[in-house]
Design a protein with these regions (language model features):
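Metal-dependent nuclease catalytic cores that hydrolyze phosphodiester bonds in DNA/RNA
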Residues: 1-88, 113
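Mg2+/Mn2+-dependent nuclease catalytic core
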Residues: 65-177
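A short N-terminal helical cap/helix-turn-helix that marks the beginning
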Residues: 188-191
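Conserved pre-motif I regulatory segment
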Residues: 195-199
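Charge-rich, solvent-exposed alpha-helical interaction surfaces
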Residues: 180-183
């Protein structure tokens, strides 16, 4: 009887952080603790998600499995949001930060990688030719500092950016995402296979 392969589960976030080793919720520059940052991050996530419109899907679960010789890799996570923009499906990743958004010129690589993973998994499973990726950064506030006023519907539009919120929208062909995702898994596999051999 053939032995059942071991399943290794890893979140999208842990996968990209392990490979890229940089960036995360920026809670260091404001002098506030991790708990404050998490609570503030949850508030801004909910604000943005509620203002996106009726066709917006929040917290979309996504799973991808790949079989290797000795084990099965299960990559899983939740996209912050998803919506249709014409013929293109857009995956949104929302990040809270204390940094100056007006000087931000591009998404943090590890954040963008997280969103691209979700875009590839959804695009593959739903036979999409291309996928949009919207990175949304919004300024956090703490209870000590006083809460910022709620974001307006105009501010959460992808084409809008100011000192409180910044958007980066990119479109990728699915073959481009597939090649990128495969390279990400190849980098992870080298480590995983080494660990397996030394068990």
């Amino acid at each position: 009887m053939e032995e059942k392969k071991k399943e290794i589960r890893i979140s999208v976030r842990n996968l990209v952080e392990f490979i890229l080793r940089s960036g995360d919720l920026d809670n260091s520059s404001g002098g506030f603790g991790e708990r404050d940052a998490m609570q503030a991050g949850t508030r801004v996530h909910q604000q943005i998600q509620k203002k996106r419109g009726a066709d917006y899907r929040a917290e979309v679960p996504l799973v991808h499995e790949k079989e290797y010789e000795h084990f099965i890799l299960r990559v899983e996570g939740r996209a912050d949001g998803m919506y249709e923009d014409g013929t293109t499906t857009v995956i949104e990743e929302i990040k809270g930060t204390y940094r100056d958004l007006e000087t931000m010129e591009e998404p943090v690589p590890v954040h963008l990688a997280q969103a691209k993973c979700y875009a590839y998994i959804y695009g593959l499973q739903n036979r999409k030719e291309e996928m949009g990726v919207l990175m949304t950064y919004t300024l956090l506030s703490s209870e000590e500092e006083g809460l910022l006023r709620p974001l307006t519907k105009e501010e959460v539009k992808p084409e809008h950016s100011n000192w409180r919120i910044r958007h980066f929208l990119q479109t990728y062909k699915l073959p481009e995402l597939e090649q990128w995702f495969d390279e990400l898994l190849d980098a992870w596999f080298i480590w995983a296979e080494f660990q397996y051999q030394w068990q």
